[in-house]
Amino acid sequence: MVNQIPRVVCDTGHNVGGWQYLSRQLGTIQCRQMHIVFGMVDDKDIDKVLDLLPKHAKFYFTKAQTKRALSETVIQEKAKKHGIDGHAYPTVNEAYKAAYRSASANDFIFVGGSSYIVGDFLKNCI
């Protein structure tokens, strides 16, 4: 846990196996609203991961500062095909700031989708 009010958690789960576990864990979270700052790299099966994401969350799609990162707009477009709406942000810092501004004390913010996303978050947002 990175912050307590609102709760902010990050995780490096970045593939289907990781998200099978993470989606179960996120399903147990008690909060008013869940916010997910999410990005992935281009060599992962994003469609299968998107199927596992909690549909009730607010999404902030972003990309890490690495050549392997999928564009935030590509993720946003793919997510729409899976019934997930959200806004796109060019950096993890901008996505996290938007989520944090939108969150209330009883909300939950999750940052993840790739080790690079978490790395950018820890480097630039903490």
Give the location of each predicted region.
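Residue-level signal for alpha-helix termini/capping positions
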Residues: G27, Y100-S104, I126
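Active-site-proximal loop/hinge segments that shape catalytic or ion-binding/gating pockets
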Residues: S114
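Nucleotide phosphate-binding/pyrophosphate-handling subdomain across enzymes
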Residues: M1-K58
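A general structural signal for well-ordered alpha-helical segments in protein cores
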Residues: W19, E72-I75, V118
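C-terminal helical cap/extension that packs against the catalytic core
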Residues: R7-V8, L50-F108
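Active-site-adjacent alpha-helix immediately C-terminal to a catalytic or transition-state-stabilizing loop
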Residues: G119-I126
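Surface-exposed, flexible loop/turn segments at secondary-structure boundaries
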Residues: D42-K44, K67, E94, I117
